[in-house]
Swiss-Prot record:
<feature type="modified residue" description="Phosphoserine">
    <location>
        <position position="304"/>
    </location>
</feature>
<dbReference type="Pfam" id="PF00561">
    <property type="entry name" value="Abhydrolase_1"/>
</dbReference>
<dbReference type="InterPro" id="IPR026151">
    <property type="entry name" value="Maspardin"/>
</dbReference>
<dbReference type="GO" id="GO:0042609">
    <property type="term" value="F:CD4 receptor binding"/>
</dbReference>
<keyword id="KW-0963">Cytoplasm</keyword>
<dbReference type="GO" id="GO:0048668">
    <property type="term" value="P:collateral sprouting"/>
</dbReference>
<protein>
    <recommendedName>
        <fullName>Maspardin</fullName>
    </recommendedName>
</protein>
<feature type="domain" description="AB hydrolase-1">
    <location>
        <begin position="87"/>
        <end position="159"/>
    </location>
</feature>
<comment type="subunit">
    <text>Interacts with CD4. Interacts with ALDH16A1.</text>
</comment>
<dbReference type="GO" id="GO:0007626">
    <property type="term" value="P:locomotory behavior"/>
</dbReference>
<dbReference type="GO" id="GO:0030140">
    <property type="term" value="C:trans-Golgi network transport vesicle"/>
</dbReference>
<keyword id="KW-0597">Phosphoprotein</keyword>
<dbReference type="GO" id="GO:0007173">
    <property type="term" value="P:epidermal growth factor receptor signaling pathway"/>
</dbReference>
<dbReference type="InterPro" id="IPR000073">
    <property type="entry name" value="AB_hydrolase_1"/>
</dbReference>
<comment type="similarity">
    <text>Belongs to the AB hydrolase superfamily.</text>
</comment>
<dbReference type="GO" id="GO:0010467">
    <property type="term" value="P:gene expression"/>
</dbReference>
<dbReference type="GO" id="GO:0060173">
    <property type="term" value="P:limb development"/>
</dbReference>
Length: 308
């Protein structure tokens, strides 16, 4: 139990990358927690947004690998926001505080939905240069819980945790997936009642993405084809919404492929970001591009990637 938490990689990450806390709202209780790693000279970094159960450190394997290649990577943890507009306004203020005009977003599950909503929210003055959507959805009604969304704030923490755990894989899984689930359960335990209630509210509050507002943004849809909380219908809906998106398919990986299939996920992220090399929206230090590109081409041979 808890193999990831005691792994050398995780401990190295925790000891070398500081967790920063930033307040951008008038309400001092709304605190963004984030890891910001890689060259500060990069002005269009890749930002990771976690799922309901996740904290910023669930992306530690992406941070370690991608910064090793010369990328600037930021992983976030949300403050307590109760609606999508409030989240988008807070996230915009955070980007202003970090002096980042445009960013690439990697969103997992709820993080993927919020990434799309933020791109939609800023479409008149775009802040999102590209999207990587991992196990993401475009309409909260798929969870059939829009009617309970307004009552999560009343529920005790143990009940909220039970709701989240109900979406975790319960069948047989391989050891790496089991470790990923254990780690996410541990992260879930670290979240307080208001953090969980607000995330579940954002996850289930009646809302959908308006694709015409973000159709010009390059998108990669990353899907897992074994057990995950998303139905086949929800995945098909994403393909319809983004007909020109690249598709990155993982045969296995469950709800948390960034933990248990990190090498594949990292490679797909690199392939996605490759298209921006040599532009002002590159997320990588230009001096290391050629070696990194070579490595990506090698790894690409063994992956399932569909161009639109």
């Amino acid at each position: 139990m808890g193999e990831i938490k005691v792994s050398p990689d995780y401990n190295w990450f925790r000891s070398t990358v500081p967790l920063k806390k930033i307040i951008v709202d008038d309400d001092d209780s709304k605190i963004w927690s984030l890891y910001d790693a890689g060259p500060r000279s990069i002005r269009c970094p890749l930002i990771f947004l976690p799922p309901v159960s996740g904290t910023a450190d669930v992306f530690f394997q992406q941070i370690l690998a991608l910064t090793g290649w010369g990328y600037r990577v930021i992983a976030l943890q949300y403050p307590v926001y109760w609606d999508h507009l409030e989240f988008c306004d807070g996230f915009r203020k955070l980007l202003d505080h970090l002096q980042l005009d445009k960013v690439h977003l990697f969103g997992a599950s709820l993080g993927g939905f919020l990434a799309q909503k933020f791109a939609e929210y800023t479409h008149k003055s775009p802040r999102v240069h590209s999207l990587i959507l991992c196990n993401a959805f475009s309409d909260t009604s798929i969870f059939n819980q829009t009617w309970t969304a307004n009552s999560f704030w009343l529920m005790p923490a143990f009940m909220l945790k039970k709701i989240v755990l109900g979406n975790f894989s319960s069948g047989p899984v391989d050891p790496m997936m089991a470790d990923a689930i254990d780690f996410m359960v541990d992260r879930l335990e670290s979240l307080g009642q208001s953090e969980l209630a607000s995330r579940l509210t954002l996850n289930c509050q009646n809302s959908y993405v308006e694709p015409h507002k973000i159709r010009d943004i390059p998108v990669t849809i990353m899907d897992v084809f074994d057990q995950s909380a998303l139905s086949t219908e929800a995945k098909e809906e994403m393909y319809k919404l983004y007909p020109n998106a690249r598709r990155a398919h993982l045969k296995t990986g469950g709800n948390f492929p960034y933990l248990c299939r990190s090498a594949e996920v990292n490679l797909y992220v690199q392939i996605h970001l490759l298209q921006f090399h040599g532009t002002k929206y590159a997320a990588i230090d230009p001096s290391v591009v050629s070696a990194e590109e070579l490595e990506v081409q090698k790894g690409r041979l063994g992956l399932s990637q569909e161009e639109p």
